[in-house]
Amino acid sequence: MKGSYKSRWVIVIVVVIAAIAAFWFWQGRNESQSAAPGATKQAQQSPAGGRRGMRSGPLAPVQAATAVEQAVPRYLTGLGTITAANTVTVRSRVDGQLMALHFQEGQQVKAGDLLAEIDPSQFKVALAQAQGQLAKDKATLANARRDLARYQQLAKTNLVSRQELDAQQALVSETEGTFKADEASVASAQLQLDWSRITAPVDGRVGLKQVDVGNQISSGDTTGIVVITQTHPIDLLFTLPESDITTVVQAQKAGKPLVVEAWDRTNSKKLSEGTLLSLDNQIDATTGTIKVKARFNNQDDALFPNQFVNARMLVDTEQNAVVIPTAALQMGNEGHFVWVLNSENKVSKHLVTPGIQDSQKVVIRAGISAGDRVVTDGIDRLTEGAKVEVVEAQSATTPEEKATSREYAKKGARS
């Protein structure tokens, strides 16, 4: 009984497995048959589909810009440092105790503003002594002159000798000399008293104080009381290659002030604009450069002493120049070239002669004309005569020129 029961279960399991296998076989055959007509139809419709894809792949995408005609400024550039127009260390010209400071650190001051005071007591005493001596000698001189006048009258009647008259004349002259010396002493004492009040010698910004109130200071102190830097105006000192000297001199002879721009350390933001002040009188033989100084009004305090800046000096403007983006200009074995697009969006290599150039645009002196479209991006995929797809047209400069560039791209796409 038990053996018959086990045999029955084995038969059931085998039947179930066979049924499942038959179902999967039938299902796979139906899917294969339903897919075959579609594949046959597709093969009939496109007998050479694979070969066609290999024969004509997608067009290479590029970006293009239109060469434009415009006035282009010519700049000379150099690295420079901002320097104060004047730097003055304010020192005391008399010895004494510092009684007061009349400025705030970092404050802008005018020439003549009171900065500090030295104890004036000793100078007032010296002035009073000099004035007293002057008054005494003034009275002595007046008396000597009166005696001389009497001697002169008596000499006419021979009541005094000639020797006595000459002696009185000499006494008057001596007293006059003493009186003049007393006047000088009074002036000197007054000057010493005036110097006890220390004033700003120039307009500018005061720095940090170098001495505190209460200290004894002297005219021989080298550190001084405070340093004033004149920043209105302020100067920019930079260098140019000696090869640019002729260009600068010729521009100066034209009679117009040369504009100099100060740009920040990253050369991305213009800080201020000034004019050329002077060229140095000799070239640095070590570096082959010449120092140039420009002056800026700096009323907005955009420039600060010892600040590092990039200098740009406008020396000329090239009129009616053909300009393209710098990205379009390439260099090969034959020289500089650009890829030019025709009306069918086919490219051809044109050798060109570049001129003034910066990071954004370049002047082309020969090789293309205004209105020509040049490839600015996707250049590595180009071959002579290849047809391309212009995916974006960029202007060389202004929004108006950008619109013109788009119009050229549309015309090429329609052709």
Curated annotation (Swiss-Prot):
<dbReference type="GO" id="GO:1990281">
    <property type="term" value="C:efflux pump complex"/>
</dbReference>
<feature type="compositionally biased region" description="Basic and acidic residues">
    <location>
        <begin position="399"/>
        <end position="415"/>
    </location>
</feature>
<protein>
    <recommendedName>
        <fullName>Multidrug resistance protein MdtA</fullName>
    </recommendedName>
</protein>
<keyword id="KW-0813">Transport</keyword>
<feature type="region of interest" description="Disordered">
    <location>
        <begin position="392"/>
        <end position="415"/>
    </location>
</feature>
<keyword id="KW-0732">Signal</keyword>
<feature type="compositionally biased region" description="Polar residues">
    <location>
        <begin position="34"/>
        <end position="47"/>
    </location>
</feature>
<comment type="function">
    <text>The MdtABC tripartite complex confers resistance against novobiocin and deoxycholate.</text>
</comment>
<feature type="region of interest" description="Disordered">
    <location>
        <begin position="34"/>
        <end position="60"/>
    </location>
</feature>
<comment type="subunit">
    <text>Part of a tripartite efflux system composed of MdtA, MdtB and MdtC.</text>
</comment>
<comment type="similarity">
    <text>Belongs to the membrane fusion protein (MFP) (TC 8.A.1) family.</text>
</comment>
<dbReference type="InterPro" id="IPR032317">
    <property type="entry name" value="CusB_D23"/>
</dbReference>
<feature type="signal peptide">
    <location>
        <begin position="1"/>
        <end position="21"/>
    </location>
</feature>
<keyword id="KW-1003">Cell membrane</keyword>
<keyword id="KW-0472">Membrane</keyword>
<dbReference type="InterPro" id="IPR006143">
    <property type="entry name" value="RND_pump_MFP"/>
</dbReference>
<dbReference type="InterPro" id="IPR022824">
    <property type="entry name" value="Multidrug-R_MdtA"/>
</dbReference>
<dbReference type="Pfam" id="PF16576">
    <property type="entry name" value="HlyD_D23"/>
</dbReference>
<keyword id="KW-0997">Cell inner membrane</keyword>
<dbReference type="GO" id="GO:0015562">
    <property type="term" value="F:efflux transmembrane transporter activity"/>
</dbReference>
<dbReference type="GO" id="GO:0005886">
    <property type="term" value="C:plasma membrane"/>
</dbReference>
